[in-house]
Amino acid sequence: MTRLNVLLHEMVPDHQIMTDEDVKNLLTTFDITEDHLPKIYHDDPAVKACGAKPGNVIMIVRKSQTAGEATSYRLVVRRPKK
């Protein structure tokens, strides 16, 4: 069975796992903690495709009509059980 890699779809922005050093620089630059970052669930298809685990920080780079490119950061967390 062939699996679809969602990261190859033209509508899905680039997702990359950040190194610990890059995360430290990000948090220092913006004077925040990881708790201040927006969250993304560990079972999100793009998170699964890039191999991220809970606790990783993902850098997402989107094309933007106004800015050319927009970068956002998300902390990978486990989805709460219902």
Curated annotation (Swiss-Prot):
It catalyses: RNA(n) + a ribonucleoside 5'-triphosphate = RNA(n+1) + diphosphate. Its EC number is 2.7.7.6. Keywords: Cytoplasm, DNA-directed RNA polymerase, Nucleotidyltransferase, Transcription, Transferase. One of its GO terms (cellular component) is DNA-directed RNA polymerase complex. It holds the Pfam family RNA_pol_Rpb5_C. GO terms for biological process: transcription by RNA polymerase II; transcription elongation by RNA polymerase I; tRNA transcription by RNA polymerase III. One of its GO terms (molecular function) is DNA binding. Belongs to the archaeal Rpo5/eukaryotic RPB5 RNA polymerase subunit family. Part of the RNA polymerase complex. NCBIfam families: PRK09570.1. DNA-dependent RNA polymerase (RNAP) catalyzes the transcription of DNA into RNA using the four ribonucleoside triphosphates as substrates. This is DNA-directed RNA polymerase subunit Rpo5. The gene is rpo5.
